[in-house]
Structure formats: C-alpha cells, structure tokens
C-alpha cells in the first residue's frame, strides 16, 4: 500500500527537503527512494534560477542570435524544467530529472556560462605555410589510392546535419579557447586554423568531460529552441556521444578520453586553441585509408581530401624538414596476413627496437593473449588510436580496428601496409619514441605509385554492446 510517510517517525529535515522539491508530501516509496538524493535535491532547490536564466539569455545573444525565440520563452522553458518533478510520479523518471538537474546546477556556469564573460586576449600564433607547393604531391598520392569501386546499390548511412551546427561551431570556437586544458580539436576545423581555404562542417573534439559538456549543451539548445534534444552513445565507438535533435539531425559529437591520455596526445597551440598535431592527424589519415568506406569517400570527393592532405604535408615538411625525393628505404614495412587467425605480422626490425609487430584484427583475441602473456605494461590510448599497445620480449602487440585491404589472395595491399605502419608510428609519437626517419620513408613511399586494384578486404571486428541514450523530454537515461 502506497501511504504518505508519518511525519512523527521520519526525519523532518529530510522529509521537508523532498517535500519542497516535489511540491507535495512524498509517498513512502518516494521518500525511501529519494532520501539518499537529498544532498543533490538541496543543491537544486537553492539554485538561483534567475542567474541561470540570465546566463542562458547571454549565451543565446552571443551564439544563437539568429534563433527566433523571446527572453520570456527561454525563462518559461527553464522554470518549467526545474519544476518538472512536481508533475512526475514515476521513480525512474524522478531519478533522471534529479541527475540531469544536478548536472546543470553544479557545472553549467563553469562550462558554458563562463563563455559569456570577457575572454583573454587571443595570442596570435599562426605560421604562414606554403600549402600550394604541396597540392600536386598530395594529388599524386591520393590518385594512387583512389581505387575503390563504388557500389551504386549500396545505401550509405550519412547523418543529416542540423541547421544549428553553425551556431554550435561559434560556441565551440570560444569553448576551445576557454577550456583548452580539457578540450582539443582535430579534423577539418583544426586544419582550417592552419589553412583558411579548408572547408569544415562540425568541429571534431576530444575532451575529458564529454558527458557533462554535452548534457549542458543539450539543455542550452533545448531552452533556446524548445526542441527535444537526444544524446546517443554508440557501442562500437569508444567513449563517443552525439547530440541530435528530435528529427535525428546531427548537431555535435565528442569523444571522451582520460586526462592521462589527453596529456600525451601531441598537440600544437594556435590562437589560444590546442589542436592535435597535424603530423599525428596525417598518420591517422593514412591509417584510415585502409578502411574501405574511407576510400569510397575519397572517390566521391577527392578535392576535399587533397586540401587536407596538402595542408598536413606542408606542415610536416616545414616542422620536421621532410624531403620529398622518393627515398623510401624499407617502407612500407613487410606485412604478412594470416586470414585464419586474423593477425598481421609486420616486420619492424629495420626501424624500431622491437623486431616485429603482431596486429590483431579481433580485439577480444588480443586481450586474451595479453592476459596469457602475464604482462601488465600495455598502453591504452582509448579513441585516440582505438587500440592498446604492448611491447613484450621484443614484440609489439596491438589491435587494428579498420579493414585490411588485399591486392591478391593472402597479400596485404600497400594502402593497408602503410596504414599499419602509421598505426605503429602513432604509438611512437604518443610515447615520445623515435619516428621521424620512419615518417619520412613512409610519406616518400606514397609518391609515384601506380593504382593497384583491391582484390578483397577483411571484415572489421564486430563490437558487442547496445546503443545508449539520454532523452531529456521523456526523462530516460539508458547506458
């Protein structure tokens, strides 16, 4: 039987806190379920909603000025959400409301509210790069890799982009400057900071507090637009979340990484923003070309890739003194695939202290083998490399999350061979190891190559797990 609690037998302070929050006397079940939440509930109850409304209005004026909504509508939406619990009787939904309100009252001011106050002066730190000089070289490299055969019957799962992306990008530019110790960017926008001719869509970010930031941003968009905003978690992408609107239009996504991973990611400082070192990004691009659908993207829009590739090539030429004369030495390193065990053996003795690298195409098999080795020195760089690395008895063990392209039965295609070499070089950069000679040879191995057709490719590792989401409107959290 669901009775009201007896005020003589229950602690009056706890009861009063819950009663004030719910706007009603709690049932016995509500009381016992919510009493451990009293600290969070107190913070929500005493939270100054007027100051919060003011901050959201300032965010709206600065970053969403073209969105047609009034100050009174924003205030009504905020006050409505902070009183939503008074009309909610489902315990699960009450827990969700408390959790999300707690995030807002404890983090919003420091994360997004701070963007409305005067910013520090921007330290201009741009270097003039001669990207034009690299365009023909980039075009030659990419042309030799433009070997994908497009299946016109194949339906590609491309996300629809929200009209709010430009507003969020404006906010993100400021966010990256204010929070440059916990958030860095990569991808097209980061290259745009080097070469203004680069086109970019949304801003790709890595950060250490992704979930909190995305919740705060989702509420900001909800309060300004009135739209239902949904946060989704994809199981096969590590620590990845995306914000979409009620029509499934993509707004922004983010990868979360640990602070110790953030500390070792190579980065450079441009206009008060940290971006992932373009050398590291170039290696990631070479690695990603081993993915069959990335080659299909190249086939559809080669000029987009050419602008990015030329920018990164010029950066490494300027920064590392790379000479593009075709001297490739032992690059790409010899790669032998065992299609039964799904392990590629890369001969590394010409460049590194470890004699070979065993590249696993199934992550769970690698994890099992590492346990059998009884070694506890593996490095996990999370979504930065999508892999752990272990060096044990002069052998590197690692996982490769992309497809492996084959140029003939049992023969690794040179595009994938270079991708595997790039994957090993990512580790060298992250651990401050030697990589420059290997980098030079790898890049030179991409010059003056003929197109080699793709015979077949291995399938990617299938990741278990289910999709998670936060639906603000329906008060549901599934993770």
Swiss-Prot record:
Disulphide bridges, residue numbers: none
Residues involved in Ca(2+) 2 binding: 202, 204, 253
Active site: 202, 204
Residues binding Ca(2+) 1: 202, 204
Alphabetical list of InterPro entries matching this protein: PolyA_pol_cat_Poxvir, PolyA_pol_cat_sf, PolyA_pol_nucTrfase_Poxvir, PolyA_pol_nucTrfase_sf_Poxvir, Poxvirus_polyA_pol_cat_C, Poxvirus_polyA_pol_cat_N, Poxvirus_polyA_pol_cat_N_sf
CDD domains: polyA_pol_Pox (cd20919)
Protein name: Poly(A) polymerase catalytic subunit
């Amino acid at each position: 039987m669901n009775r009201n609690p007896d005020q003589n037998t229950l602690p009056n302070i706890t009861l009063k806190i819950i009663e004030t929050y719910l706007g009603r006397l709690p049932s016995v079940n509500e009381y016992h379920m919510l009493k451990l939440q009293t600290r969070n509930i107190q913070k929500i109850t005493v939270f100054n909603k007027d100051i919060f409304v003011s901050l959201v209005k300032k965010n709206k004026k600065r970053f969403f000025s073209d969105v047609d909504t009034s100050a009174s509508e924003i205030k009504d939406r905020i006050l409505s959400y902070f009183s939503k619990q008074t009309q909610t009787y489902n315990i699960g939904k009450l827990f969700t409301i408390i959790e999300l309100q707690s995030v807002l009252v404890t983090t919003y001011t420091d994360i997004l509210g701070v963007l409305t106050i005067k910013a520090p002066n921007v330290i201009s730190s741009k270097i003039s790069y001669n990207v034009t000089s690299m365009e023909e070289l980039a075009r030659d490299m990419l042309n030799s890799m433009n070997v994908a055969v497009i299946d016109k019957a194949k339906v590609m799962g491309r996300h629809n982009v929200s009209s709010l992306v430009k507003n969020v990008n404006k906010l993100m530019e400021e966010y990256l400057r204010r929070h440059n110790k916990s958030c860095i960017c990569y991808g097209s926008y980061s290259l745009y900071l080097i070469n203004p001719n680069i086109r970019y869509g949304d801003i790709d970010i890595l950060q250490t507090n992704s979930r909190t930031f995305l919740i705060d941003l989702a509420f900001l968009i909800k309060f300004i637009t009135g739209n239902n905003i949904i946060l989704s978690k994809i199981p096969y992408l590590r620590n990845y979340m995306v914000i979409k609107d009620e029509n499934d239009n993509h707004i922004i996504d983010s990868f979360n990484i640990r602070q110790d991973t953030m500390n070792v990611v190579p980065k450079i400082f441009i206009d008060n923003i940290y971006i992932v070192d373009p050398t590291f990004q170039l290696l990631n691009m070479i690695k990603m070309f081993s993915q069959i659908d990335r080659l299909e993207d190249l086939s559809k829009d080669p000029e987009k890739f050419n602008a990015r590739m030329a920018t990164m090539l010029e950066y490494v030429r300027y920064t590392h003194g790379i000479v593009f004369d075709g001297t490739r030495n032992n690059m790409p390193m010899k790669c032998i695939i065992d299609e039964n065990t799904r392990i590629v053996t890369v001969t590394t003795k010409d460049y590194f202290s470890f004699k070979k690298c065993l590249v696993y195409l199934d992550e769970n098999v690698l994890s099992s083998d590492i346990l059998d080795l009884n070694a506890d020195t593996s490095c996990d760089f999370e979504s930065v490399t999508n892999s752990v690395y272990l060096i044990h008895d002069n052998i590197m063990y690692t996982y490769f999350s992309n497809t492996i392209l084959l140029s003939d039965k049992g023969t690794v295609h040179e595009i994938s061979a270079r991708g595997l070499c790039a994957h090993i070089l990512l580790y060298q950069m992250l651990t401050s190891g030697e990589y420059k000679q290997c980098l030079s040879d790898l890049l030179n191995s991409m010059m003056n190559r003929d197109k080699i057709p793709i015979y077949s490719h291995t399938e990617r590792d299938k990741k278990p797990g289910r999709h998670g989401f936060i639906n603000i409107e329906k008060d549901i959290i599934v993770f």
